Amino acid sequence: MIRMTAAAAATALMVGTAFAQSGIPPELFDNTRRVAGDSLIVCFDQTSLSRHFDQAIAEAIGDALFLEVKVIEGFGGFPLNGEGFVDELSLAMNNSCDMFMGISVSVNSPISEAFAVTRPYASVPFVVAVNNTEWQSLSDVPKDLRLGTAMASLGELNLINWNLQQPEDQRWRRLPYPDPNLMATRVLDGTLGGMILWQPVLAQLQREREDAKALRTVASQPLPESMVRVGALVSSRNTFLRDQVDQAIDALVADGSIAAIMDEFGYTGHAGE
């Protein structure tokens, strides 16, 4: 099952537990401090939909700081509710990782005191994809057609909240999908009028499936914009590293490096905040 790492990580961060307060046996934590001034150890969720993009960003950050980036694949395959993620993340950040990539950055999300969040390095939207050449926005999709949504995603929550504010006969029927491949198939065969999903997922589908290239994005109106701001985690004990990474991100946004990486991967949205 494919998940968006940012959503899983946000679930984990909402737990708000520090290393010492987690359910992990204390003997599993290595409390010695790593001393390696010439390298940056970067970890990833191996099931992340933006895994390769995040690594490209990490390598650009490393180059900007004159540090060798060393990759640790990390972990993945957690359920949608994020169970187990915070423990694995805590162990990794304490024992082996300098930075964990692909985190949804939100000023309103409570963060564990064990972690510090960098500036966003990219802001990437949820999009509406349809297989109809005449529709220009979601408002053109008839209400008697069903919409697919990426299960437990920000885009799905956005539609739920909008529907709740409308009369029943003005709501779209929602079908949540854990598998974006199947959801795309249902849009293509007409079972669904359209689908709401994170844009990098659509970009990946269109790279991997020739038939998915027929899908086109339309404006999300009347829904408000759903934008995921993607950043990284560092240990809250390493304020120097966070400051250096933030400065590197600012420089890479300013000189167009991150925008170029987004273009390379076919991501829409914009670099930085």
Say what each PLM segment does.
Residues 21-24, 55-64, 132-136, 142-154, ...:
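Extended ligand-binding regions for polar small-molecule ligands
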